A protein has these predicted regions:
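A short secondary-structure junction motif
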Residues: 50, 54-58, 87, 91, ...
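Active-site segments that bind and position negatively charged phosphate/pyrophosphate groups
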Residues: 61-174
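A glycine/threonine-rich phosphate-anchoring loop and its flanking beta-alpha core
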Residues: 1-72
Length: 226
């Protein structure tokens, strides 16, 4: 699966490919040398994997291929969340010092393999729909995973998820945004936020996978309150 965007950076669509890559090679040293913000953004994307797959399963929804989330996908998605809780903060600390470690190795596996299997086979829900909706704003300079982290905060608030406080604390400790202010959108107008809600609802499959149903008006309120 590939994600396509318009020239202006706004979300276009998911492109379903005929086959997966034959091989994925990830050099730990390359990841360790990359800007830390990129890896942290990857954590934000991975963090949503479990909660979106869980929502998709509860809503009897479908993944981007049109199938129901399988057991393996849900196991991988849960392992993704558990790995972040166990290793994410330590991995960021090590990467900030420019060194690799077992925690970094596990984080790379989580961000790339577990999250990839979990989201593609498990399905997406509100967190990604919001992240895609935010791309209509030229002033939103957040990386994809950062926008997903914000979307996840909104999703978990909507669902009244018991993990809400744990997820917010994790995001604060690693530096992932969970509020409009942290996204650099603290001054966003009501009209622009309504446009984000409109764009969010255009992600019809993702919205159908959200177990806690929401209106556009409620979504605007939740984004303001996040």
């Amino acid at each position: 699966i590939s994600v396509l965007y318009h020239e202006d950076g706004s979300f276009d669509r998911y492109l379903i490919l005929d086959k997966n890559p034959d091989l994925v090679v990830v050099d730990t040293n390359v990841v360790a040398a990359a800007p830390l913000r990129m890896t942290v953004a990857g954590m934000g994307d991975a963090l949503a994997t479990y909660f979106e797959a869980r929502s998709c399963a509860a809503a009897h929804g479908t993944n981007e291929h049109g199938g129901a989330p399988g057991h393996l996908a849900l196991v991988a998605a849960r392992a993704c969340y558990d790995t972040l809780m166990e290793c994410g903060i330590a991995a960021k600390r090590d990467l900030k010092k420019g060194r690799t470690s077992p925690a970094v190795e596990r984080l790379i596996e989580c961000n790339i393999l577990l999250s990839g299997v979990g989201f593609e086979s498990g399905g997406l829900a509100l967190a990604h729909a919001i992240a895609n909706g935010l791309t209509i704003l030229p002033e939103c300079k957040a990386m994809h995973g950062e926008a997903v982290a914000f979307g996840l905060a909104v999703q978990l608030r909507l669902e009244r998820a018991p993990e809400f406080d744990q997820v917010l604390e994790f995001c604060q400790r690693v530096g992932l945004p969970t509020t409009l202010e942290e996204l650099g959108l603290g001054e966003i107008s009501d009209a622009d936020l309504q446009s984000v809600a409109d764009a969010t609802f255009k992600n019809e499959r993702n919205m159908a996978n959200e177990q806690a149903k929401v209106t556009k008006q409620k979504l605007v309120q939740l984004m303001r309150e996040a």
